Design a protein with these regions (language model features):
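Helix-loop junctions and terminal segments of transmembrane helices
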Residues: 69-86, 155-156, 278-306, 375-378
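Hydrophobic alpha-helical transmembrane segments
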Residues: 131-136, 164-221, 392-395, 409-433
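Membrane-water interface segments that mark the loop-to-transmembrane alpha-helix transition
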Residues: 19-35, 57, 66-119, 128, ...
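Interfacial/gating helices of multi-pass transporter permease domains
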Residues: 39-63, 131, 188-193, 233-245, ...
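Membrane-interface junctions at transmembrane-helix termini in multi-pass inner-membrane proteins
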Residues: 142-168, 361-390
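Interfacial segments at transmembrane-helix termini and the short loops linking adjacent helices
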Residues: 118-137, 334-364
Length: 441
């Protein structure tokens, strides 16, 4: 065990959560700045139409991957924490073996499907044969995306420092690459290549670091013991949990990808680029929401299992801090968004101001809901959380189609804000009606 793990275990639960979150947010803060600069340089170099085309290429690959992503990271944490706390390396090793197998199979399947479907999906989004070739080439990076188990291993052993560094890799590559591409007035294929290399590299780094951690803590303890026969059925409830987190992950990600491609289909690549730009800027809040879930889930699971009152403290205080931070960004966008977009990106992107404000509001609501969702998972109510997000996603997609058709891009932002409030309200009611002594675990 390293010094990082020793020192974190000595902290009270809330301080440990904040310490781990700070480790990640330092990396994410630098990454967010570089990602924004890279996006801004690409937008300035290519213009709205070709910028939107790169966005559609990336979104297509992410959409296909999301369809086959079983989000094994949460399974490793949910079922790995008890084994880790009891130093049961055999059970932990078998769990990781099962989850790794799922990662490998799903990433290979996603790559094959993306390559097969690309010639048909590309033209429907306004792509010519050249763009379709770029779309197929970009799809190959999906082979590197089976990283759920790797992320779970690093979270299990409190290596949030590694996760923090990993988050800076893709933005750094894109930042450096975009500077050179902007300086040389590069073509669209150069930017597609930069984005693909960055995306693959960050995944390969995580796989490498998790392998080192696995070899140190688990493989050595399993010397002479075979785990090749590990099966999904060895873990009670794991199959159900994976299906729940699969659908939950899709409910989080797929609507965003679907709506981006729908805007490209209905309004054109330029408008799809503006929507993606607003999402990229609102990721200043949506990405911390993901980080909070990564950091907080381990401690919430442990405190719920132990029946500690720290469970409520961690969940509610983190939600309040997230809400206060998010509102600052919403107000900044409302009052200064037009000036900032015009200065940083150019006047042709000022039209994204209104949708940006709504997307930041939706991201703020998601930021508040993020620790509550981890609490729901820790309590054993993952299926109930998923049902809330099914309702939210249904509302979002219906409102998106209706409001975008009538109001344009601003309708997409309004739909996102209304839908984001649904799971927040539902999870608050669910948590308030349950106490640690009623744990389902």
């Amino acid at each position: 065990m390293n010094k990082s793990e020793d020192s974190l275990k000595q902290l009270n639960p809330m301080r440990r959560v904040l310490a781990n979150f700070w480790i990640l947010i330092r990396g994410r803060g630098a990454a967010a700045i570089m990602a924004f600069v890279a996006t801004a340089l690409m937008a300035r170099t290519l213009g709205p139409a070709e910028f939107g085309m790169v966005i559609l290429i990336h979104t297509y690959a992410m959409f296909i991957r999301a369809l086959l992503d079983f989000d094994s990271v949460d399974a490793v944490v949910r079922y790995g924490v008890p084994a880790h706390d009891e130093s049961d390396s055999h059970t932990l090793g078998r769990l990781i073996r099962v989850c790794r197998r799922i990662d490998w199979q799903s990433s290979i399947a996603a790559t094959l499907i993306a390559l097969i479907v690309a010639p048909f999906a590309g033209p429907s989004m306004g792509m010519d044969s050249h763009h379709v070739m770029l779309l197929m080439a970009y799809s190959v990076v999906l082979l590197t995306t089976g990283v759920g188990t790797a992320a779970g291993i690093l979270r299990l052993y409190n290596r949030f420092d590694i996760l923090g560094r990993q988050m800076t890799i893709a933005p750094t590559i894109r930042f450096i690459g975009a500077i050179f591409a902007w300086w040389l007035s590069a073509s669209i294929q150069v930017f597609v290549a930069i984005w693909a290399i960055a995306y693959a590299t960050e995944h390969l780094y995580m796989l490498w670091q998790a392998k080192l951690k696995y070899n140190t803590h688990i493989k050595e303890a399993l010397a002479g013991v075979s785990i090749k026969d590990a099966k999904l059925s060895d873990f009670n409830g794991l199959h159900h949990f994976l299906w729940v987190t699969y659908w939950q992950s899709n409910l989080d990600i797929l609507p965003k990808h679907i709506t981006t491609m729908l805007v490209g289909y209905l309004l054109g690549p330029a408008e799809a680029g503006l929507l993606r730009l607003a999402r990229e800027l609102s990721s200043m809040l949506s990405k911390p929401a993901i980080l909070i879930r990564q950091v907080i889930f381990v401690d919430l699971t442990r405190n719920w299992n132990q029946g500690n009152q720290a469970f409520d403290v961690i969940a509610y205080r983190t939600a309040l801090l997230g809400g206060a931070l998010g509102l600052l960004f919403v107000m900044a966008s409302y009052f200064f968004g037009e000036h900032l977009l015009g200065t940083l990106l150019g006047q042709q992107f000022v039209a994204a101001k209104s949708i940006l404000t709504f997307m930041l509001l939706a991201a703020t609501l998601d930021l508040v809901a993020s620790p509550l969702r981890s609490a729901i998972y820790a309590m054993g109510y993952a299926a109930k959380a998923m049902r809330l997000y099914v309702v939210s996603t249904s509302i979002y997609l219906i409102l998106f189609v209706v409001l975008t058709a009538k109001m344009g891009l601003i309708g997409a932002g309004l739909a996102a804000s209304v839908a984001a409030a649904v799971p927040l309200i539902g999870m608050l009611m669910l948590i308030r009606g349950s106490r640690p002594d009623n744990s389902k675990n």
